[in-house]
Amino acid sequence: MALAACGGGGVSDPPLSGAQALAFAYFQKCVNPIFVTPLQVAVGGTTTTKTCAAAACHASATGAGGAFRIIATAQPVDLSSAANTPAVIRTSDLYKNFTSALGETVIASPSQSLLLNKPLVRNVFHGGGVVFASTSDSNVRLIEYWIANPVPQGQDEFSTAIYSTMFSPAFNPSSPNSSTCNSF
C-alpha cells in the first residue's frame, strides 16, 4: 500500500523477509472450531455457556471483544481443490478468522500470545471471563501447538511441509477428516 508523503512522494511498507507463518490447514481443522463451539465460561462467579463468536463477545459485526473478531458462519475451505488458490482462500471468511487470530499471537511463543492469555485470564483482563480453566485444557493444547509450530522459514501459511508433523496420520486435503490434530 502506498501512502502519500510530504513533498508528493510515496511511502510504502518494506517487503517481509524471513518472517514465519502459522499453518492455515491446522487453524482450519483444529483451532477455528474452538471459537464456534459452546464452551463453559466463568464470569464473576457465574458459569454460562457461550461461544467466542457470540454477539456479545467476538462476533465479527457486533462483538464487544476488541480487535479479535470471528465470523461464526465461516465455512471450511476445500484445500484439495485446485480452484482454491492462495488468492482465493485469502478472500474467504475462514481466512478472515485466521488473520484475526494471528493478530492475537506471537509466533512460536504461546505464553506471550493474547489468544491464550486472555481466555486463561493469565496476567491480562478478559471481559469474557475465564474460558479455559487451565493450560491442560485440550483446547489450550491445540492453540498452543498451532502457535508453537510455525511453518518452515520462507514458506507461507499454505505450506504442506507441516502436514506430517501437525496431524496424525499426515494431513490429506482430499480427506481432511482422516487425520487428527496433534497437540502438546
Identify the function of each model-found stretch.
Residues 1-4:
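Bacterial N-terminal signal peptides
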Residues 6-184:
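Aromatic- and Gly/Pro-enriched helix-to-coil junctions and flexible linker segments
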